[in-house]
């Protein structure tokens, strides 16, 4: 056990967060995301919500200052977003510093970013459009 590391962060996730360099991206996905078929390393975090994991990792993770560090999937035409999902994520990400803007991109553009991500963390999140991409920055 390590002191001050949340027990929600598995050893595998902790290793991945440490191995990521600035500019690398990680996705925290909902339970329905097609992570296995997209290619990068997949980490299971079944039973945990995305917001709980964000709250756990943000004290350890510097967000990028040079490019938009937060990306979520936009709703497909004719569908709607639940604003409470983004609000929960913003709340979790605001623990260390003000939360940067979240950029929304279409579903297929998000999948393309996911293919290039350092890792995808599949959670137990059931919220529709509950996926978020974080771009790692340089530690001060």
UniProtKB/Swiss-Prot annotation:
The active site is at residue 22. This is L-fucose mutarotase. Gene3D superfamilies: RbsD-like domain. Substrate binds at residues 30, 107, 129-131. The lineage of its organism: Bacteria, Pseudomonadati, Pseudomonadota, Gammaproteobacteria, Enterobacterales. It is an enzyme of class 5 (isomerase). Belongs to the RbsD / FucU family. FucU mutarotase subfamily. It comes from the Bacteria. It catalyses: alpha-L-fucose = beta-L-fucose. Its EC number is 5.1.3.29. It is found in: Cytoplasm. GO terms for molecular function: fucose binding; L-fucose mutarotase activity. Pfam families: RbsD_FucU. Keywords: Carbohydrate metabolism, Cytoplasm, Fucose metabolism, Isomerase. One of its GO terms (cellular component) is cytoplasm. Involved in the anomeric conversion of L-fucose. Pathway: Carbohydrate metabolism; L-fucose metabolism. Homodecamer. PANTHER family: FUCOSE MUTAROTASE. Its main location: cytoplasm. One of its GO terms (biological process) is L-fucose metabolic process.
């Amino acid at each position: 056990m390590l002191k001050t590391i949340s027990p929600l962060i598995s050893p595998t996730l902790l290793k991945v967060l440490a191995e990521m360099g600035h500019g690398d991206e990680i996705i925290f996905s909902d339970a329905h995301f097609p992570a296995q078929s997209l290619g990068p390393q997949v980490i299971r975090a079944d039973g945990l919500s995305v917001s709980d994991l964000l709250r756990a990792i943000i004290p350890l993770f510097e967000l990028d200052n040079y490019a938009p560090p937060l990306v979520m999937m936009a709703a497909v035409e004719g569908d709607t977003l639940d604003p409470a999902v983004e609000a929960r994520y913003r709340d979790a990400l605001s623990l260390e510093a003000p939360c940067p803007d979240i950029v929304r991109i279409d579903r297929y553009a998000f999948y393309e970013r996911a293919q290039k991500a350092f890792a995808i963390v599949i959670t137990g999140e059931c919220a529709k459009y509950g996926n978020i991409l974080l771009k790692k920055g340089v530690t001060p």
